[in-house]
């Protein structure tokens, strides 16, 4: 994922946010060689896809939401599989695959049983964060054409992000956004398939929630910069992981000042009015929010820190968006 750098006075926040993306993994059973990263929910909320890091590799597993039992999606033995996304009919999963050092990440699509893998991406670009349109005819994804950094204290990374759409076989690629971005989040497509929501940040613009038309590509048709209570930074709020839900509102994560550092809680914003609704309270450090297509369930990672404040493990949580109840999902079968 990208947010997916020239440093401004907020350079510390930018570095923190990049670390936020790099460190988003979960350890299980005390075995640091097994870590869980990004999550995705099937359309009916019955399955979760996660990427599981093993040493220098990572592979995608499907997890039953009722039992927590995990099974491998593919038979890959090298590289890194990340950022899974279910098709709206639940029959396919798209994900990002990085072959290894010296290569760029590309998008792969497989049947939900792991068969019939199909990959497409140019070797000179970095593709990331695929999502399906509700009519199951289009994939929207982000692409970075540059790799490097503008500061000696930052690790090299992909930037100059743009968003594209294509047919399911990777053909008919067309650009959606009229500009490139320093950082971007994963996209989420509206229920009617006519627009997408992302969090963007430019070289000269602060972080914002932006809604783009998928019918008439160009500048954003609407931008929002919600201010949550006790927000971490009023000028440049820390927010990410926007998700459209069926009623047209957007569910996202934002950072506020908590008792023991930042709380990355989940909020809902009404697009037409900007009205905010808080859905969780005191998450601590949390990442990778994803909402099911029916808008009933969200999945995310909640982190635990050690005595020195380092991230050491996290837990997959499920949030009922109606009752606002959260519960942990204990995953087995990752070895």
What residue spans do the PLM features occupy?
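Sequence signature of WD/YWTD-type beta-propeller architectures
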Residues: 27-335
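Bacterial N-terminal signal peptides
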Residues: 15-24
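A cross-taxon signal for low-complexity, glycine/charged-rich
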Residues: 2-6, 14-15
């Amino acid at each position: 994922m990208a947010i997916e750098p020239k440093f401004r006075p907020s350079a510390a926040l930018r570095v923190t946010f990049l670390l936020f993306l790099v460190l988003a993994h979960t350890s299980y059973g005390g075995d640091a060689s097994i870590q869980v990263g990004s999550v995705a929910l099937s359309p009916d909320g019955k399955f979760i896809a996660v990427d599981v890091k093993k040493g220098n590799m990572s592979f995608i597993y499907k997890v039953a939401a009722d039992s927590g039992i995990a099974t491998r999606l593919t038979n890959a033995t090298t590289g890194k599989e990340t950022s899974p996304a279910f098709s709206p009919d639940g029959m396919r999963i798209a994900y990002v695959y990085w072959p290894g050092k010296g290569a760029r990440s590309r998008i792969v699509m497989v049947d939900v049983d792991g068969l019939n893998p199909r990959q497409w991406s140019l070797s000179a670009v970095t593709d990331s964060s695929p999502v399906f349109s509700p009519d199951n005819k289009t994939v929207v994804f982000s692409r970075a054409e540059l790799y490097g950094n503008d500061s000696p204290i930052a690790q090299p990374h992909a930037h100059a992000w743009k968003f594209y759409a294509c047919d399911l076989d990777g053909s008919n690629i067309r650009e959606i956004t009229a500009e490139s971005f320093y950082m971007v989040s994963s996209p989420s497509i509206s229920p009617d398939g006519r627009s997408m929501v992302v969090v963007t940040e430019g070289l000269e613009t602060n972080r914002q929630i932006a809604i783009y038309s998928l019918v008439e590509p160009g500048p954003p048709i609407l931008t929002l910069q919600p201010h949550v209570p006790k927000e971490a930074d009023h000028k440049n709020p820390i927010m990410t992981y926007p998700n459209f839900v069926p009623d047209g509102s957007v569910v996202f994560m934002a950072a506020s000042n908590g008792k023991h550092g930042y709380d990355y809680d989940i909020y809902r914003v009404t697009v037409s009015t900007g009205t905010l609704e808080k859905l969780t309270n005191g998450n601590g450090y949390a990442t990778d929010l994803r909402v099911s297509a029916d808008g009933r369930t969200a999945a995310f990672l909640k982190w635990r820190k050690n005595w020195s404040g380092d991230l050491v493990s996290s837990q997959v949580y499920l949030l009922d968006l109606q009752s606002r109840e959260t519960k942990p999902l204990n995953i087995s079968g990752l070895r």
